[in-house]
Amino acid sequence: MNNLQTYVEAVKIIKEAILRSQYRAASSANKEQLSLYYGIGCYVSKNSREGFWGKGAIDTISQQLQKELPGLRGFSAANIKFMRQFYETWCEDLKSLTTVSGIGNDKSLTAVSEIDIQSLMPCESPQKEDFDIASFLGLGFTHHMIIIRKTNSLTERLFYIRQALANRWSKEVLAARIEDDLFNHQGEIANN
């Protein structure tokens, strides 16, 4: 199979997953969006890092998705790379997702948006008891990407997820709080 056929197949598979997810997103937007992005991130990671996709594959897939789904937003090459980063950042901390476990073998996104959310729990993490799946799923993808890009540890990521939700921070406020290093200064305010 040549690269063009592979990309056409990839576009078809991702397009089907996107359309399924968009239908259900009306009732649970963040949950569905994060599930879809995590699944696409997994698929892209397996194929671009471990598979045989060449340079430019993500750009080609993004362009083809835009052609086949006019008006589609959020699937630029940069955003697809962010999805891959989202998956790669969280995959070590979250349990394996059984509904997409064969993703690297059969190159399909079997019900990406039907990921079992209860299986999204940290593995062997001292913060396991502090992990709140509702908080994780309650935060939008843009907020997650700000946290991923600007923090260094799971503990720090979880702190900013909880704070962003509790305080209803906009993405600008979240970025400012991270820049202010609120995580490392949180005890200082109480001690002053």
Give the label of every model feature segment.
Residues 1-192:
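Basic, low-complexity intrinsically disordered segments
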